From Swiss-Prot:
GO terms for molecular function: ATP binding; enzyme regulator activity. GO terms for biological process: nitrogen fixation; regulation of nitrogen utilization. Signal peptide: none annotated. Belongs to the P(II) protein family. Keywords: Nitrogen fixation, Transcription, Transcription regulation. It comes from Methanothermobacter marburgensis (strain ATCC BAA-927 / DSM 2133 / JCM 14651 / NBRC 100331 / OCM 82 / Marburg) (Methanobacterium thermoautotrophicum). Could be involved in the regulation of nitrogen fixation. PROSITE patterns: PII_GLNB_CTER, PII_GLNB_DOM. The gene is glnBB. This is Nitrogen fixation nifHD region GlnB-like protein 2. GO terms for cellular component: cytosol.
């Protein structure tokens, strides 16, 4: 089993959800997160007014950008399909498209039934 973690733009959440559901993956977690990559700023990504832009420039800081984090655990043969689907929906070729991480999952347990492994998915 693997956990696929994707950080995407909020505006792409519905399309991503719809594609995953259409492929047979309706179960996942989605969380509102704040973050940034290596870029210093993303023009037009957010419209949150800064209380003091001069201070931001002087300190060299950057506010974090609102994103969505999707976490979905799938069986090994399904990883490529899920990753490709997320990539297809979210790829624009522009800074801020997001990131995808694939992590190993040793075990899973369904609390209600006690099912383990892939049966718990």
């Amino acid at each position: 089993m693997k956990e696929v973690i994707a950080i995407i733009r909020p505006k792409n959440m519905k399309k991503t959800r719809d594609v995953l559901e259409s492929l047979g993956f309706p179960s996942f977690n989605a969380t509102r997160v704040l973050g940034r990559g290596k870029q210093r700023a993303i023009i037009d990504e957010v419209t949150i007014p800064s209380p003091s832009p001069e201070i931001d420039e002087v300190r060299g800081t950057m506010r974090y950008i609102p994103k969505r984090m999707i976490q979905i655990t799938v069986e090994d043969p399904d990883v490529q399909l899920v990753v490709e689907a997320i990539m297809k929906v979210n790829h624009t070729g522009k800074i801020g498209d997001g990131k995808i991480f694939v992590c190993p999952v040793d075990d899973a347990m369904r609390i209600r039934t006690g099912d383990r492994g892939t049966e718990a998915l």
